[in-house]
Design a protein with these regions (language model features):
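Polybasic/polar functional segments that serve as interface/processing modules
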Residues: 1-140
Length: 140
């Protein structure tokens, strides 16, 4: 679990996070992590980092509609930002938006399980998780 030092003088606050997965063939339960959504109520922070590794997805999914996947990731970004273009969910408070984004789904783009951690800087924790769970996984 990341425990970065930083902005708040070392006072860590709890956060919850979920990975964003692309599951090309739901019946096979194979997935590629493409992002992380992190929420910290005490820090009033909801953030997302996402990147689509098109080559890796093509290896699992011979005929992908990656533009549709990218559009779904764009909607997730809008919801996290609270941008009304993201739909009705984007207008909810941050805790409820995280709840919707982390709710189990049987779709091509879906969240992984929710995990918890402590960090004094949730933005730095999000970046560390993104590197560990998405970027490093892509380079395996």
């Amino acid at each position: 679990m990341p425990e970065p030092e930083g902005a708040s003088g070392g006072q860590r606050a709890p956060f919850a996070y979920t990975t964003i997965r692309v599951v090309p063939r739901v019946e096979r339960e194979e997935f590629v992590n493409v992002g992380v959504v992190l929420y910290s109520r005490p820090r009033k922070y909801l953030g997302v980092q996402a990147r689509l590794d098109r080559e890796r997805l093509r290896a699992l999914w011979p005929d992908p509609d990656l533009d549709a996947v990218e559009r779904q990731l764009d909607v997730i970004r809008l919801v996290v930002a609270g941008n009304p273009t993201g739909g009705a969910i984007a207008l909810l408070p941050a805790a409820e938006r995280f709840g919707w984004l982390s709710a189990p789904a049987s779709t091509v783009v879906q969240p992984g399980p929710v995990h918890a951690g402590l960090a004094d800087n949730p933005e730095a924790a999000l970046h560390e998780l993104f590197i560990e769970l998405v970027e490093l996984a892509s380079s395996d």
